[in-house]
Amino acid sequence: MQVSVENTSALERRMTIAVPAERVENEVNKRLQQTAKRAKIAGFRPGKVPMNVIRQRFEADARQEAFGDLVQASFYEAIVEQKLNPAGAPAVEPKSFEKGKDLEFVAIFEVFPEFTVSGLESINVERLSAEVADADLDNMLEVLRKQNTRFEAVERAAQNDDQVNIDFVGKVDGEVFAGGSAKGTQLVLGSGRMIPGFEDGLVGAKAGEERVVNVTFPEDYQNLDLAGKAAEFTITVNSVSAPVLPELNEEFFAQFGIKESTLEGFRAEVRKNMERELRQAIKTKVKNQVMDGLLAANPIEVPKALLENEVNRLRVQAVQQFGGNIKPEQLPVELFEEQAKRRVVLGLIVAEVVKQFELKPDDAKVREMIEEMASAYQEPEQVIAWYYKNDQQLNEVRSVVLEEQVVDTVLQKATVTDKSVSYEDAVKPAEAPAAAE
């Protein structure tokens, strides 16, 4: 078999392959012999049909089948021989497939980039440290109480944070407009759910009162027909309800699946969850900085096939997440290109770090991570057992642990600055990660 390779770009290869005619004819004859054993042709007993008849009837199909199989087999043999690592399926261009001649075809494909990860010493990482103070815990308890607020009807005038039940009719230029009317709407004043001025116009209103509120739709309002226009809403207040925060008692604790009957026990459980969240937030911020540093220090070209695959995967993911009657291919590629490129480049760089430093998932760290996740459940031992019985889930944890080991490897060579911050600053969402160039 003859093979020649042309580098048409940094990652694209144009490979010409010639398969000897003898091998081609052997493959064709092999298929014809198999066909002869099972062919049913009038006037002949099964398995007794003369080969010239078989060849006349089935040679074209046998040759086409042999072509497909030989292209696949010889392409694989060629990339092994040439030590190439394709990043996707090849585009095949037949050149010659005449009877008695060599089979010639061209395979065009991309290869994975070959590179060595470098510049780890140039990466700067700010590693945060924080503690869950009593004040942080108190704030969290108030947040939990507010999330479980109930409303009780009152006979006073409405004020911010009250919930009102309203009917309303909106008009623009004296005409009722689509989507501008509703009945029985529950609205918490001050929530910012309605357009500016609407909720303010109900402060001071009582149950049974009708008010006319004049507002202007924002210039950037999603409905372009209404953007920037003045509107008049006639609003009837059906009821006014005041917020009532739940007591910190056993009934409240039970809503969170916590069996503790004392405030001290509940606070201890909440603190434990906050500390878990804190550890994860700090770890995530360190990881993002490491990944950004790896990207900046190792600019690499990415195979188009990998990018296309990742874009398509993100499209499918978006449709599954947001639903709607839309097909993944209808979503613009531009929406996902930047994210897809970052993920593909990081995937290649992380894989190379694993290879260069000969990293393998640490079983002790795998166990530690599973125990950490299981601690959030009431029956942690059952969760741990489930992970170790489920190969797919266990492998996912092993992948995460391996990625953490990559981060640890980089941190050993990077410049790391430790900084103490408040709990609030530590758990604050990080800025969007940098895009791959």
UniProtKB/Swiss-Prot annotation:
Its main location: cytoplasm. GO terms for cellular component: cytoplasm. It holds the Pfam family Trigger_N. SUPFAM superfamilies: FKBP-like, Triger factor/SurA peptide-binding domain-like, Trigger factor ribosome-binding domain. Involved in protein export. Acts as a chaperone by maintaining the newly synthesized protein in an open conformation. Functions as a peptidyl-prolyl cis-trans isomerase. NCBIfam families: tig. Consists of 3 domains; the N-terminus binds the ribosome, the middle domain has PPIase activity, while the C-terminus has intrinsic chaperone activity on its own. This is Trigger factor. It comes from Pseudomonas putida (strain GB-1). The lineage of its organism: Bacteria, Pseudomonadati, Pseudomonadota, Gammaproteobacteria, Pseudomonadales. The gene is tig.
